[in-house]
Regions:
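Active-site rim/loop-helix segments in enzyme catalytic domains that contact anionic ligands
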Residues: 1-112, 236
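Metal-dependent de-N-acetylase/amidase catalytic core
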Residues: 1-15, 98-241
């Protein structure tokens, strides 16, 4: 039974872990805008360096990575993020390795989020003409494994303790999903939609179609229609013990 996400006044911080610059803007930027509006501090963690997603023969890996990093910083300003962390793993080569899990766990311990939002760790075959990106799956799997048990358990990676990063228990995990698979729906206000669209437009190297606003509203509108909302984003939500 689909349910609405209700704000929890005890929550103060949230973290979004994604593979690439623009992934969060496509998947959960309305919810990020809403969280910030509700007084939640939000941090992004970008797993890859964003160095591969271009057909422009003038681009190099180094130049593209620098552009995409700046675009993500600008999108973060639109949404009101506290900070954006860049882990710098090679784009299009991301795997759910122990190194990636540890790097994400370090950021969880550093920022101590109550909510962690991540990508679907399974291949999505819901969208016509799209078979899913392996980096997205890797980022989702590593994020979930970092939440439990790596960030939680004090004796996992003692060197993180030496760095000053003690264990932390995330209280909720929101996995980004399409409207057909989500079981929790976050209702978005017009203010949230405007910021989500503006944030996505910050990614000029990747978002090169003119109807960004219309598409975003159509996507969020279709999601919201499942539960009687004008706009919404869908998640699988886990409350952790």
């Amino acid at each position: 039974m689909p349910r609405a996400i209700e704000p929890n006044p005890a929550y103060k911080r949230a973290m979004v872990v994604v593979a690439h610059a623009d992934d969060a803007e496509y998947g959960c930027s309305g919810s990020v805008a809403k969280l910030v509006r509700e007084g939640i501090e939000v941090v992004y963690v970008l797993c890859t360096d964003g160095s591969k997603g271009s057909d422009d023969p003038q681009d190099t890996q180094e130049s593209l990575s620098a552009v995409r990093k700046q675009e993500q910083i600008e999108a973060g300003k639109v949404l009101g993020l506290t900070t954006v962390e860049f882990l710098g793993f090679p784009d299009s080569e991301l795997e759910p390795t122990l190194a990636l899990r540890k790097a994400i766990a370090r950021e969880i311990r550093r920022h101590k989020p109550d909510i962690l939002i991540c990508q679907n760790p399974t291949r999505s075959l819901e969208i016509a003409g799209y078979v899913g990106h392996p980096d997205h799956q890797a980022a989702g799997e590593a994020a979930l494994s970092a939440v439990y048990p790596t960030a939680r358990d004090r004796l996992t990676y003692p060197d993180l303790l030496e760095e000053g990063f003690g264990p932390h228990k995330v209280r909720e995990v929101w996995v980004m999903l399409g409207p057909e698979r989500g079981d929790f729906f976050n209702e978005l206000e017009e203010e949230d939609m405007k910021k989500a669209v503006a944030a996505l437009k910050s990614h000029e190297s990747q978002v090169q179609y003119p109807e960004v606003d219309a598409r975003m509203r159509e996507w969020r509108g279709r999601t919201g229609a499942r539960v009687g909302f004008k706009f919404a984003e869908a998640f699988k939500v886990f409350t952790l013990g």
